[in-house]
């Protein structure tokens, strides 16, 4: 029996994780849950899974949750300290890190320091503080298992092979809803259009990131830290069908890929059950029915966010943290209809240009950079 804490339990990844747990009550048990927005949904999860402790966004949410609780009454915490408490609970074997954005960094670090294995869906943790997290993972001898479908695919495609035999890793991207949209038409993109992803059902922030290709850029940086790959050995190819989740090319010219239906329950189930496998509940792949798989190069002129991510990775230091923080502010502004679609990448680039990078050592230094970038990005809002 593997005991889990889920950070971000009411979000897209959290809900999919709980669906996998429902299918395998004999393999997984829920010890802790943390969420930030939907107290009513958390109350229902508490009733069903009976965790020992939970955390919510703030004191007001904690009070509201107490009023909604039924017969089962777990310990209730709140804030980032509360999420960190859930991440480090005694008796937890694995923490599913699925809080959206840089807010997931502190509780993920707390989990690692407490010796918990990590199923990582929060890519921002590695984008912001990849060097720190990698060092802590090695120091505390925990497993860092990717939940993103692309990184899970690479993880599986690397299994059993020597690192020195890898020529490059290739991340696939759906291309988002605007793959065929002209640069001129992108100026008129609406929020509603950007929120309609052609393949995946996800939360609002990551859906916008997928539309700008910033999500793929963040995944490039995440892949660098997960697999110890330099930027020049990480490629991106657009694959609209989202069936091949990513690939590894070896020095002999052979390419190993992982295929599957576009359903996050598959990489989640793999991370939860690793090194074994378990049923995920997804539809089995029918290649004859799919018939055609296509590929094309990403257009970094129309989608400069991907270029900015590569630039940040190559520059190193605190640039990836600045990229991420500025993007979070810009996407939030777009979701509030304060800026246009193309303004997202423009705000990120201006913030990066205003930054002088350095190499942080401690967590608080990374968080200070994150705060600086957010404050600076806000100065570029209309």
UniProtKB/Swiss-Prot annotation:
Sorted UniProt keywords: Isoprene biosynthesis, Manganese, Metal-binding, NADP, Oxidoreductase
Annotated residues for binding of 1-deoxy-D-xylulose 5-phosphate: 123, 149-150, 174, 197, 210, 215-216, 219
GO MF annotations in UniProt: 1-deoxy-D-xylulose-5-phosphate reductoisomerase activity; manganese ion binding; NADPH binding
Reactions mediated catalytically: 2-C-methyl-D-erythritol 4-phosphate + NADP(+) = 1-deoxy-D-xylulose 5-phosphate + NADPH + H(+)
Cofactor: Mg(2+); Mn(2+)
Keyword NADP annotated: yes
UniProt binding sites for Mn(2+): 148, 150, 219
Major enzyme class: oxidoreductase
Family matches, as InterPro entries: DXP_reductoisomerase, DXP_reductoisomerase_C, DXP_reductoisomerase_N, DXPR_C, DXPR_C_sf, NAD(P)-bd_dom_sf
E.C. no: 1.1.1.267
Pathway in which the depicted protein is active: Isoprenoid biosynthesis; isopentenyl diphosphate biosynthesis via DXP pathway; isopentenyl diphosphate from 1-deoxy-D-xylulose 5-phosphate: step 1/6
One record GO biological process: isopentenyl diphosphate biosynthetic process, methylerythritol 4-phosphate pathway involved in terpenoid biosynthetic process
Record-listed NADPH binding positions: 10-13, 36, 122, 124, 203
Entries under SUPFAM superfamilies matching the protein: 1-deoxy-D-xylulose-5-phosphate reductoisomerase, C-terminal domain, Glyceraldehyde-3-phosphate dehydrogenase-like, C-terminal domain, NAD(P)-binding Rossmann-fold domains
Pfam families: DXP_redisom_C, DXP_reductoisom, DXPR_C
Family: Belongs to the DXR family.
Function comment: Catalyzes the NADPH-dependent rearrangement and reduction of 1-deoxy-D-xylulose-5-phosphate (DXP) to 2-C-methyl-D-erythritol 4-phosphate (MEP).
Name the record gives this protein: 1-deoxy-D-xylulose 5-phosphate reductoisomerase
Originating organism: Chlorobium chlorochromatii (strain CaD3)
Primary gene name: dxr
């Amino acid at each position: 029996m593997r005991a889990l804490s889920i950070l971000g339990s009411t979000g897209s990844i959290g809900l999919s994780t709980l669906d996998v747990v429902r299918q395998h009550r004999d393999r997984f048990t829920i010890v802790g849950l943390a969420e930030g927005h939907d107290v009513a949904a958390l109350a229902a999860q508490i009733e069903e899974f009976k965790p020992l402790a939970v955390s919510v966004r703030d004191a007001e949410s904690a009070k509201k949750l107490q009023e909604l609780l039924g017969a089962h009454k777990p310990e209730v915490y709140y804030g980032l300290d509360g999420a960190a408490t859930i991440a480090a609970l005694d008796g937890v074997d694995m923490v599913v890190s699925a809080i959206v954005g840089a807010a997931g960094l502190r509780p993920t670090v707390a989990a690692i320091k407490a010796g918990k294995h990590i199923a990582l869906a929060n890519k921002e943790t590695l984008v912001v503080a990849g060097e720190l997290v990698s060092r802590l993972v090695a120091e505390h001898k925990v497993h860092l298992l990717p939940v993103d479908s692309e990184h899970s695919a690479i993880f599986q495609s690397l299994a059993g092979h020597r690192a020195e035999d890898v020529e490059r890793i290739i991340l696939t991207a759906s291309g988002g809803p605007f793959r065929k949209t002209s640069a001129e038409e992108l100026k008129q993109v609406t929020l509603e259009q950007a929120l309609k992803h052609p393949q995946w059902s996800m939360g609002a922030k990551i859906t916008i990131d997928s539309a700008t290709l910033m999500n793929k850029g963040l995944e490039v940086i995440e892949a660098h830290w997960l697999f110890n790959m330099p930027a020049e050995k990480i490629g991106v190819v657009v694959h609209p069908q989202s069936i091949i989740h990513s690939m590894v090319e070896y020095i002999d010219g052979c390419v190993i890929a992982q295929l599957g239906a576009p359903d996050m329950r598959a990489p989640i189930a793999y991370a939860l059950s690793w090194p074994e496998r378990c049923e995920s509940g997804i539809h089995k792949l029918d290649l004859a029915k799919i018939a055609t798989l296509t590929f094309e190069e990403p257009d970094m002129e129309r989608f400069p966010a991907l270029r900015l991510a590569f630039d940040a990775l190559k520059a190193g230091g605190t640039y990836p943290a600045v990229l991420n923080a500025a993007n979070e502010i810009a996407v939030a502004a777009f979701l509030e209809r304060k800026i246009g679609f193309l303004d997202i990448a423009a705000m990120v680039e201006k913030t990066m240009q205003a930054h002088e990078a350095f190499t942080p050592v401690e967590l608080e230094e990374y968080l200070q950079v994150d705060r600086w970038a957010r404050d600076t990005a806000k100065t570029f809002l209309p």
